[in-house]
């Protein structure tokens, strides 16, 4: 997906470039991640999809078309991704973190849903009443994006773009100490040099530190966390741990 809707060939060029830069950084640091892919991207970028799988990362569903979400995407994207990858798709994230039917996700056999940013961002995310950390809805594990305790400051991609890295890393460390884990997400287009393309008409907070700057920031974040001894894992690996914890019988 891209920040603003673009013709398919332009969007694919940006997304493929950015995905490869992310993969380079992960490979350099020896860590695994989860790639939430639209079926549209998977069908049009087979070489990148193969690289994602060959390098040991998880593929999860992200709908079909990022700009035209449909209720049927929950089933269609899973079916398409499983056909293309030969893997069971366990996770789902709705494009733009919009609401999605947990009942339908559970019916389709998903293990987890990561479509919630429990932050308070007027006009975007208004989720102060939602849990900050993992919880269950039926048999489906909910994995919200991490926000800080108390004020729920979001630590997603936009914060990493614009906060001083010392401050961003300090907030990440605070969440890790408080919650025991940290969940964040980025987009491939953030790793494309958006500042070199005024025709995209991106606002400053979006293009700030894009391209090489985001490569350096992601690398810095990973190295900082590894130096502190924190392990990295895919969402499916994390889900198995949390499900075991949440489903553990109460001790009498």
Protein language model features and the residues they cover:
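Short catalytic helix/loop segments, enriched in acidic residues and glycine
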Residues: 5-24
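Alpha-helical scaffold elements lining the catalytic groove of polysaccharide deacetylases
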Residues: 65-84, 131-180
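C-terminal domain-boundary segment and adjacent tail
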Residues: 18, 27-30, 165-252
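Metal-dependent polysaccharide deacetylase catalytic core of the NodB/CE4 family, i.e.
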Residues: 23, 27-101, 107-116, 122, ...
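Short, small-residue-biased leader/transition segments that mark boundaries at the very start
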Residues: 1-3
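The substrate-binding groove and active-site-proximal loops of carbohydrate-active enzymes
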Residues: 7-13, 37-38, 61-68, 89-90, ...
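Soluble, non-transmembrane catalytic domains of enzymes that act on hydrophobic metabolites at membranes
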Residues: 106, 124-137
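Aromatic/hydrophobic pocket-lining residues that form the small-molecule binding cavity
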Residues: 15, 19, 45, 70, ...
């Amino acid at each position: 997906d891209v920040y603003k809707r673009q013709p398919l060939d332009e969007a694919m060029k940006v997304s493929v470039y950015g995905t490869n830069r992310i993969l380079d950084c992960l490979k350099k640091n020896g860590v695994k991640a989860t790639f939430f892919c639209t079926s549209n991207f998977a069908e049009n970028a087979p070489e990148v999809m193969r690289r994602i799988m060959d390098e040991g990362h998880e593929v999860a569903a992200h709908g079909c078309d990022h700009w035209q979400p449909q209720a049927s995407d929950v089933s269609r994207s899973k079916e398409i991704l499983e056909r293309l990858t030969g893997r069971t798709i366990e996770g789902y994230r709705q494009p733009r973190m919009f609401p999605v039917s947990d009942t339908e996700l559970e019916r389709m056999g998903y293990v987890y849903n990561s479509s919630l940013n429990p932050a308070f961002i007027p006009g975007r995310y208004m989720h102060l009443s939602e849990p900050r950390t993992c919880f269950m809805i039926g048999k489906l594990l909910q994995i919200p994006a991490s926000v800080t305790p108390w004020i729920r400051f979001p630590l997603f991609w936009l914060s990493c773009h614009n906060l001083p890295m010392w401050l961003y890393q300090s907030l990440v460390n605070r969440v890790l100490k408080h919650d025991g884990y940290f969940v964040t997400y980025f987009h491939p287009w953030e790793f494309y040099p958006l500042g070199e393309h005024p025709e995209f008409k991106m606002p400053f907070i979006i293009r700030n530190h894009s391209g090489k700057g985001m490569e350096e920031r992601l690398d810095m974040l990973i190295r900082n966390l590894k130096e502190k001894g924190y392990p990295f894992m895919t969402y499916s690996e994390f889900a198995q741990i949390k499900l075991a914890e949440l489903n553990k019988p109460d001790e009498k």
